[in-house]
Regions:
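TM-adjacent membrane-interface loops and short helices in multi-pass inner/ER membrane proteins
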Residues: 222-265, 279-280
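Hydrophobic alpha-helical transmembrane segments of multi-pass inner membrane proteins, especially
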Residues: 12-18, 26, 37-232, 270-328, ...
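Short, Lys/Arg-rich, polar N-terminal cytosolic tail immediately upstream
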Residues: 1-2
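Active-site-proximal inter-transmembrane loops
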Residues: 106-114, 230, 266, 333-341, ...
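Transmembrane helix boundary and interhelical junction motifs in multipass membrane proteins
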Residues: 167-172, 247-253, 263-265, 278, ...
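Transmembrane alpha-helices of multi-pass inner-membrane enzymes
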Residues: 13, 18, 331-369, 373
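Transmembrane helices with small-residue packing motifs
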Residues: 30-31
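Glycine/serine-rich anion-binding loops at beta->alpha junctions
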Residues: 113-123, 164-166, 244-249, 338-350
Length: 441
C-alpha cells in the first residue's frame, strides 16, 4: 500500500522554517561584540555569518531527525517512551556537572562539541511520549486518583530540577503541557483544581524572589525604567510599533542594530513585526494556528489511543511555546526566555520541534493507511450485498432504498449510513473521536 501523510502540515512547517532562516539571517547581519563574547563563553565560536551557517546545519540535522521520527514504527516509540524519559532526566541533571554551561546566571546547557544543547527541550518531547503511553494504558481508570498522581509526581521531579537551574519558563510550559494532556484523558476536574490550589503558595514563593519580582514589576510597567530593567520590553514595543501595517522592509529594521537584546532568539518575532509589519506578523501567527488545527485534526482521526494522545500532546507542546513567545514579545507575560518554534535561532528547539513534526506525520500516515484499508473493506461489503448480486445472504429493502447487513457483521447499513457493531455512525474513512477521554470504542 502506498504510504501517505499530511502534506499540508509538512508545507506549513517548511514555510515556518524558511521564515526562520530569513529572520535569523536578517537579525544577525550586524552582530555586536557583546553577543559574540556571550557565545564564546559557551564554547561556541561564531563570526558574523556563523549564525546562519550554524542554523542551516541545524536545519539539516532537524530534517534527518524528522525523517527518522516519520519512519520509526510508532509501536517501537511507545515501548521506548519510559527509557527516553529517563535519558532526558539524565541529560537534565548533566547541567550540574562539568559538562554544564553557566550563562546569565543559569545552568541550562550542556556542552556537546562544537556546540551546546538545552536538555529542557528534550524533556518536553519525552514527557509527551511518556504521557501518551501512560494515558493509553490507563484510559479506563482515569477516575482513579492514582492515575492522576503518577504523572504529577514525575512532572514534579522535573520541575524541581528546572527551578534549581533556574528555568522558570521551562517549568511553566512543562506544567501546562502535563495538565492539558491529563485533562484530555478525562481526569476528574476536581483533581486538577486541587493541584492548582496546592501550587498557588509555591508560585507565590517563587515570584517573591528578588529577580523574579523585578521581572513582574517590569512586566506591569516597563516604562518606569525604560533604560534599565524595562529596556528589552520597551525596545520590543518600539520594534512592533515601527513596523506599522506593512513593515519597514526586509533587512531594513533598526532595532537589531544593538538596541533589542536577544533579537535573534527570544525576541525574533519583534523583528518580524518591524520588518514585515502587522501583516507579516499576523501571517506567521496564522501559520502556527493552522499547524495547531492540523495537529488536532490528525489526533481526532487517530484509531489508536497512543496515537491520539501523541498527536494532541505534540500539537499542544508547539502551541504553548508559540503562545508564550507571542505573549512575552507583546508584553502580555513577563520575560521567560522561551524561543519561537521553527523560527528562533537555536539548535535544541529546532531539532526537537522538527522531531515532533516527524511524529505527527507518522501518526497521519498510520491513520490514512487504516482509513484506506477500512474503505476497501466497506467497498467489498457493499459489492457483496448489492441488489445486483444473484447469490448471497438474504436482504431486505427499506423505504430509504438502503440494505440491511447481517447483524453478526462488523458493519450495518441503515438509512444511508454505515454503523459499527456499537451502533456508531462511521463514514468508512474515519472514526468518531471525542475531545476528552480519548478515542471512543
Amino acid at each position: 500500500m502506498k504510504q501517505s501523510y499530511d502534506r499540508l502540515l509538512l508545507f506549513i512547517v517548511l514555510l515556518l522554517i524558511l521564515v526562520g532562516l530569513t529572520a535569523v539571517y536578517s537579525s544577525t547581519s550586524v552582530i555586536s561584540p557583546d553577543l559574540l563574547e556571550k557565545y564564546h563563553k559557551k564554547g561556541v565560536m561564531l563570526s558574523q555569518f556563523g549564525f546562519i551557517r550554524k542554523q542551516l546545519l541545524t536545519m539539516g540535522l532537524g530534517l534527518i531527525a524528522m525523517f527518522m521520527a516519520f519512519k520509526i514504527p510508532l509501536g517501537l516509540i511507545r515501548k521506548m517512551s519510559i527509557p527516553l524519559l529517563v535519558i532526558s532526566l539524565v541529560c537534565l541533571l548533566m547541567v550540574f556537572t562539568k559538562f554544564g554551561i553557566t550563562a546569565g546566571g543559569a545552568r541550562r546547557w550542556i556542552r556537546i562539541w562544537p556546540s551546546t544543547f538545552q536538555p529542557s527541550e528534550l524533556v518536553k518531547l519525552c514527557m509527551v511520549l511518556f504521557l501518551s503511553f501512560y494515558m493509553s494504558m490507563t484510559r479506563y481508570r482515569t477516575e482513579k486518583f492514582t492515575s492522576f498522581l503518577v504523572p504529577i509526581l514525575i512532572m514534579g521531579a522535573f520541575q524541581v530540577v528546572f527551578l534549581k537551574q533556574p528555568d522558570f519558563g521551562a517549568a511553566m510550559s512543562l506544567g501546562l503541557l502535563t495538565i492539558s494532556m491529563l485533562f484530555l484523558s478525562g481526569i476528574r476536574l476536581r483533581y486538577i483544581f486541587s493541584l492548582g490550589i496546592l501550587v498557588i503558595p509555591v508560585v507565590i514563593k517563587l515570584i517573591s524572589e528578588p529577580y523574579r519580582w523585578k521581572r513582574v514589576a517590569t512586566f506591569l510597567d516597563p516604562w518606569k525604567d525604560p533604560l534599565g530593567s524595562g529596556f528589552q520590553l520597551v525596545q520590543s514595543f518600539i520594534a512592533l510599533g515601527s513596523g506599522g501595517l506593512t513593515g519597514v522592509g526586509l533587512g531594513e529594521g533598526k532595532q537589531k542594530l544593538f538596541f533589542l537584546p536577544e533579537v535573534h532568539t527570544d525576541f525574533i518575532f519583534s523583528m518580524i513585526g518591524e520588518e514585515l509589519g502587522f501583516i507579516g506578523a499576523a501571517l506567521v501567527a496564522l501559520l502556527f494556528f493552522t499547524f495547531f488545527l492540523k495537529g488536532i485534526s490528525i489526533a481526532r482521526k487517530a484509531a489508536d489511543p497512543f496515537h491520539y494522545y501523541l498527536a494532541y500532546g505534540l500539537s499542544i507542546m508547539i502551541a504553548i511555546q508559540a503562545i508564550f513567545n507571542f505573549a512575552v514579545v507583546t508584553g502580555m507575560l513577563p520575560t521567560k526566555g522561551l524561543p519561537l518554534p521553527f523560527i528562533s535561532y537555536g539548535g535544541s528547539s529546532l531539532i526537537t520541534s522538527m522531531t515532533a513534526v516527524g511524529l505527527l506525520l507518522n501518526v497521519s500516515r498510520n491513520y490514512r493507511q487504516g482509513a484506506e484499508a477500512e474503505r476497501d473493506e466497506l467497498s467489498a461489503r457493499r459489492q457483496s450485498f448489492s441488489p445486483n448480486t444473484e447469490t448471497g445472504p438474504s436482504r431486505s429493502r427499506s423505504r430509504t432504498g438502503s440494505h440491511s447487513l447481517p447483524q453478526s457483521g462488523r458493519y450495518q447499513w441503515q438509512r444511508g449510513y454505515w454503523y459499527t457493531r456499537e451502533n456508531r455512525r462511521t463514514s468508512g474513512t474515519r472514526r468518531l473521536i471525542g475531545l476528552r477521554g480519548g478515542p471512543r470504542r
